[in-house]
UniProtKB/Swiss-Prot annotation:
Entry's Gene Ontology cellular component terms: cytosol; Dsl1/NZR complex; endoplasmic reticulum; endoplasmic reticulum membrane
Source domain of life: Eukaryota
Bilayer topology: Peripheral membrane protein
Signal peptide: none
General remark: Present with 6020 molecules/cell in log phase SD medium.
Transmembrane stretches, start-end: none
Pfam families: RINT1_TIP1
PROSITE patterns reported for this sequence: RINT1_TIP20
Self-association state and partner proteins as the record states: Component of a peripheral membrane protein complex consisting of DSL1, SEC39/DSL3 and TIP20. Bound to a SNARE complex consisting of UFE1, USE1, SEC20 and SEC22 or YKT6 through direct interaction of TIP20 with SEC20. Interacts with DSL1, SEC39/DSL3 and the cytoplasmic domain of SEC20.
Organism, scientific name: Saccharomyces cerevisiae (strain ATCC 204508 / S288c) (Baker's yeast)
Record's subcellular location: Endoplasmic reticulum membrane
Protein name in UniProt: Protein transport protein TIP20
Amino acid sequence: MNGIDDLLNINDRIKQVQNERNELASKLQNLKQSLASNDTEVALSEVIAQDIIEVGASVEGLEQLRAKYGDLQILNKLEKVAVQQTQMQAGVDKLDSFERQLDELAEQPPDQFTLDDVKALHSKLTSVFATVPQINNIDSQYAAYNKLKSKVTGKYNDVIIQRLATNWSNTFDQKLLEAQWDTQKFASTSVGLVKCLRENSTKLYQLSLLYLPLEEETQNGDSERPLSRSNNNQEPVLWNFKSLANNFNVRFTYHFHATSSSSKIETYFQFLNDYLAENLYKCINIFHDDCNGLTKPVIHEQFINYVLQPIRDKVRSTLFQNDLKTLIVLISQILATDKNLLNSFHYHGLGLVSLISDEVWEKWINYEVEMANRQFINITKNPEDFPKSSQNFVKLINKIYDYLEPFYDLDFDLLVRYKLMTCSLIFMNLTSSYLDYILTVDSLNETRTKEQELYQTMAKLQHVNFVYRKIKSLSSNFIFIQLTDIVNSTESKKYNSLFQNVENDYEKAMSTDMQNSIVHRIQKLLKETLRNYFKISTWSTLEMSVDENIGPSSVPSAELVNSINVLRRLINKLDSMDIPLAISLKVKNELLNVIVNYFTESILKLNKFNQNGLNQFLHDFKSLSSILSLPSHATNYKCMSLHELVKILKLKYDPNNQQFLNPEYIKTGNFTSLKEAYSIKYLKDTKIQDALYRIIYGNIL
C-alpha cells in the first residue's frame, strides 16, 4: 500500500487479480486439451500408416482403407501410383511377349511376310506403348520399362523393317533397272508394267512409314543414326525413293567413280541437271499414288532429295581436299546448283549448301575478298585508265554481284553471317576504296594547264556520280534490304541502308569537295580573262547609246569577249558531264555570285559612269551571266541586288523623282517610298544610301 487511495480501492484490486487467475487457468486447460488432441492425431496417423504398409500395395487394399478412414488425399495419390505400376507391369509383360514373338519371326524368310503382317505388328506394338502412362519422376521400374521398350523397338526395326526393306528394295531395284524407266526405252504405254512398278513403290513407301523412331533419336538430334535412318536428315529412310534414285546412282558411279580424278566438278552437276530435267516429271507421272500418300508434291520433293545423295557424297569427299582452287570451284557449283534446284525444279528441301562447314565458308570468303581486291587494283593502278575507271569499276561490281547472287538467293539462316561479310568486305570496302582512288588520282602530265585540271575535276565528279548511282541501285536489291533489316533488328539501329555511310561519303565528295573545287577553278580562270576588262576607265565618257538588254543592236565590250568565250566553253563542258542537276545548278549559282561580285567590287564601285556607261555595264553583265543558262524561275539574291543597284544609280536621269536625291532624305536612311516607286525588293537600305550618295557626289554623270 502506497497510500490512502490504494486502501480505498482494495476491493477492485482483489477482483482484478481473480480475473487474471481465471484467465490463466483457462489457457492451461486449453493447452492440456490441445496436447491430448495432438497425441490422438499422432496415434491415428501411426495406425493409418501401418494399415497402408500392410494392405496399401494394391488398388483393392486402398479401397478398404478408403472405406475405413474416408477419402484421404494420401490414399488418392497412392491409388494413382498403384494404377501406373499395374499398367507398367502389364506393358512390360506384353513387351516381353512381343520380344519373344520377334525372335520367332526372325527365323522366318522375308518372302513369308506381307505388308499387312507388318502393319499388324506395328499396331500391336504402338498400342502397348499407348497403355503405359508417361510419368515425370523416373523410378527404377519406369527406367527398366524404357530400356525394354528401346530394345524391343530396335529389334522390331532391325528384324522386321530393315530386313524386309532390304529384301523388297533389292527386288525393286532390279525391276527398275530392267524396266529402264528413266530412259527413252521405257515402254510407258505398258499399263501392266507401270502398275507393277507403282505397286512396288507404294509397298516400300508404306513399309518405310512403319519404322518406329527410338527414344534417343527424337532427343539427341544429330546423334548417330541407325542404318534405317536417312543420312541427310532425321526422317526415316523412304526405301521406295532410295530405289527410284538407284538408277541415277548407278549411272553416276559408272561415269564418275573410276575417272573422278580427271572429271571436272562442273560435269557432276550438269549430269544431275540433265537427269532431273529428263526424269523428274516422268517419275511423278509413273509413281504417284494419292490414295496411299504418294502425292505428286511428295514425289517431287523426295525424288530430288534421294537423287542428290551421290552428289552429296561426292561433295563431302571433295570438301575434305586441301586444294583451294578445287574448293572454290566446288562452292561456286554448289551455289549455282542450289539456285537451279530452286528456280528450275522448285525444290525446297535441304540443298547442297548445308554440307559446307564454317571453316570452308571462311576460306571461300577470304578468297573472294582477295580476288575482288586484286581486280580492283588492276583497274585503278594505272592513272592513264582514269577516264574509263568508273565504267570498269561498275562492271566489276556487277560481275561480283552476279557471281554472288545464287549465294544471296539461298534462304539459309546460317548464311546470314557470310552474306553480311561479303557486303562489308567486298561491296562496302570496294566502293569506299574507289572514292579514295578518285579523290587522289592524277592522270595529267607535268605540262598541264589550269583548264585541264578543271576538266579532270569535272571528270572525277562524273565518275563519282556514276558509281554513286550504282551504289543506290545496289542498296535497293532485296538481299541488301533484308540484311539492313537484320542489322537494324539485332543492333537496334535505324540504317536506311547498309551503304548509308558510303553514300554519305559520296554525297559529301560531290556536293562539297568537288563542287567547291569546280567553282574555285572556274573562278580563277574567269578572273584571269577579266584582267583587261577590269582596266576599262571610259565608263563615264561613252557616247554611243547602248541598250542594256542583249540583242543585235548592242554588243558587249571588246575586253569582255574573251571572258565570254572562255566561260561558254567551260559551261558547255560542265553541261556535257553526267553529274547531278542539283550540283550543276549550285555550281552555276555560285559562279553567278562570283560574276556579280567582280562586276560590283571591281567595276561598279571603282569607276564613274554616265548613262551610256551604266547601260553598257548592265549589258556586259547580262552577256556574261546569261551563259550560265540558269532557269528563269531561279532567283539569285546578289544578281537581283545588282540590278536594283543600277536602277537606283539611274535615278540620276529620272527628272520625276529627283526628291530622292535630297541630302536630307538620303541622310534619314528610310527609303520606303523610294522602294515602292522603283519596286526595290532585295537591295538593303545601306546599299541604297551608298548609291544615292554616289549620285550626289558626282560619280554618276
